[in-house]
Amino acid sequence: MGNCLKHFKQQLPSIAPKPLIIPPIFSARKRESESLQIRGLKKATKKFRQDRVVECEDYSVRKFYKGYIDETTFAPSRAGTGIAVSVMECDSSRSLQDWMAVVRSLGQLSHQNLVNFLGYCCEDNKPFFLVFEYSHKGSLDSHIFGKEEEALPWEIRVKIAIGTAQGLAFLHSIKNSPLNRELRMHNIMLDEQYNAKLFYLEPTKRSLVDEGLKRGRFTYLSPEWGSLGILDMTTDVYIFGMILLELLMGSKDRKKIKEEQGLVDYWTSSFLPDNYKIEEIIDPRLGSDYSANAATQMGTLINRCTAHNTKKRPLMQQVLDGLNHIAEIKD
């Protein structure tokens, strides 16, 4: 296969979500090829220099390089559109055919709350390049768990939660929807206006789940996923509830949580629907710059999302409705 960057025009999916308060853009994309040689990507990213690395997660074995290209011609351009180029190796674990399957999956998804997939570039027996839009504010993880002076205001946190919920509601609305097994804070990207965009690559395989457990990344593991290996839309809802919880608490310091007690168990045993309890749990960096009523309502929503009984968890559209209501609470 020769050097090429391929991108796609858009058409509406067969099933669209219910109307949202923040209007989404729905479309699935049919592929029309346009070439960009690999040397163009190298030029755009300064030959994949280390100082161009913008995102690197050891859990998902991928690395992104920042570059700039002309939005129309896809040629390297200093004044062009920011891109994030991911270099994927074709080896015994993932072949060229595997990555092409990923490309086909990405080509069917387009939404304002999904990171825009611009195309791919590959050669036989060479690395496989996936090209995405560049997220100028980085990942949500870097803001919530970063430096104290970078703490996000309450209104921005709610806005990010709504955007993330919109992306998930869109995915859940599609027939035979792919479930977002990579839904984590570090895969929620933010643009310059703090609009949330889900980075979706492919459903997480069981081997990745096992590897995550070995590395201690069990914070988001739902009861049915961990014990029975059951994965469905309610699993996504549970994971989203965990993200809401970390948005609310804002700290990875688990010293106050007993080692044998999970984050959800700590939450459910500590949370009561009153303002005083919320003040003990909420991110202290917020000070008093938040609505205690809104935070309490978010706590109630978290409880619903993380219910052990999957039948008691709300649909993502219901979660979105709840968040839109929370956004309107000012007292």
Swiss-Prot record:
Domain notes: The protein kinase domain is predicted to be catalytically inactive.
Alphabetized GO MF terms: ATP binding; protein kinase activity
Organism: Arabidopsis thaliana
Disruption phenotype: No visible phenotype. Slight hydration defects of wild-type pollen placed on the stigma of plants lacking both BKN1 and BKN2, but normal pollen grain adhesion and pollen tube growth.
Gene Ontology cellular component annotations, sorted alphabetically: nucleus; plasma membrane
Lipid attachment, kind S-palmitoyl cysteine: C4
Role summary: Collaboratively with BKN2/SZE2, involved in compatible pollen-stigma interactions.
Places the protein is found: Cell membrane; Nucleus
PROSITE patterns xref list: PROTEIN_KINASE_DOM (PS50011)
Keyword vocabulary terms for this entry: Cell membrane, Lipoprotein, Membrane, Myristate, Nucleus, Palmitate
An example Gene Ontology biological process: pollen-stigma interaction
Signal peptide region: none
Entry-linked InterPro entries: Kinase-like_dom_sf, Plant_Ser_Thr_Prot_Kinase, Prot_kinase_dom, Ser-Thr/Tyr_kinase_cat_dom
Name this polypeptide is given: Inactive serine/threonine-protein kinase BKN1
